Amino acid sequence: VKHTLPFFLILLVALADGCDRRSRAVSATGGCDESIKLPEGFCATVFAESAGPVRHLAVRKNGDVIAGVLDQRRTRGGLVVLRDTNHDGHADLEARVGEEGVHGVALGSDSSLYVSTATSVLHYRFGADLAPNPRYDTLITGLPQRRPQSHSLAIDPRNNLIVNIGAASEGCQPTPTPNTPGRDPCPELDSTGGLWSFRTDQTMQGLRNGVRIATGLHNAVALTVNPRDTSVYAVSHGRDMLHEFWPALYSDLDGATAAAEEMIRVASMRADYGWPYCYYSYFANQRVVAPEYGGDKHQTTRCGRQIQPLTVFPAHWAPMAMLFYTGTAFPPAYRTGVFVAFHGSALRAPLPQEGYVVAYVAFKDGLPAGETQIFANGFAGGMMSPEGAEHRPTGLAQDAAGALYVSDDKGGRIWKITWRGAGKD
């Protein structure tokens, strides 16, 4: 089922000024979106339509949904705040703030909002209005721009801000060319390839003011804090370009499948997860030395002391967000684990592209238990490719009632997933 805005509402939103905080009407109607395939008893309704290229989400206690929107071609970025005033499951009121693309969003207290741009983290405050006050504090400045859409955010129990800074290269080579060894030691690890912790009560901090809590992560875009154990978790993008950079060693099939996406828990300060010296081999089920550092697909020297992932996912699925479910609205089978949104692959040729799903990983005794379940599918539509997909999952959030929200940076849609009971549609 596809839903569209009436023309006059499209025109109203298009003409609105980006700095205008006035709330305005929006529309998304219809019942369950049958294009989104879910386990029996679940329903995905279109909460918002045409929100723009949305990355991450947050939900306030009052149910307002906050979305970070990227700059993309002629679409301005910034923050979008959406409200369902009549409680029908669809946003009917919208306010926008800012004109700079936003990737990460994280709520501190219910009135305190942190957002990341290409180079900064900004602190907004909510008052009585739908939108936050447009005057903000610059909490962090000068973040590396080499992978600007990677600055995901999370708040830890001590009210520190956790920031991902993705690595710019695949194997820390001085030039991205075939058969080029990596630099050893890798200077990129000084400022990228890990997670940093910053204080939330200081402004104009630079990278030097942060504390690196994890290193050796290629690009940990999916980032969260588990409320149950208060630990920082992430799902990191595995490396790319194994076949393109090392064609004599890796076939095109190797390049499509070898380097897994890794779910990790930050086990200790400055925990090391291997990049660029090692990567996790999906089929060998262990870390192996990267070819830039003399690896042969099997060698494991210098990888033994690096922390192993909790679980792994297929190569190139592109994990974008993760959320530990804490509600009681979903059945018990979905109350112990974590949802992961996958943007979908672009580099699995000669195999078909994969991903474009929301997966669920059950936990038991603090560890993943059982097989990964594809919880929500059908986002891509008829073609699984970055260009051909109708929608690509990016963000996850949960409201106070236990509904799950999923955002999309391709079609600009936000879904609200609820449990209606087995045998109901």
Each predicted region: which residue ranges?
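Beta-propeller domain segments
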Residues: R21-L38, A167-R208, G216-N219, T224-E387, ...
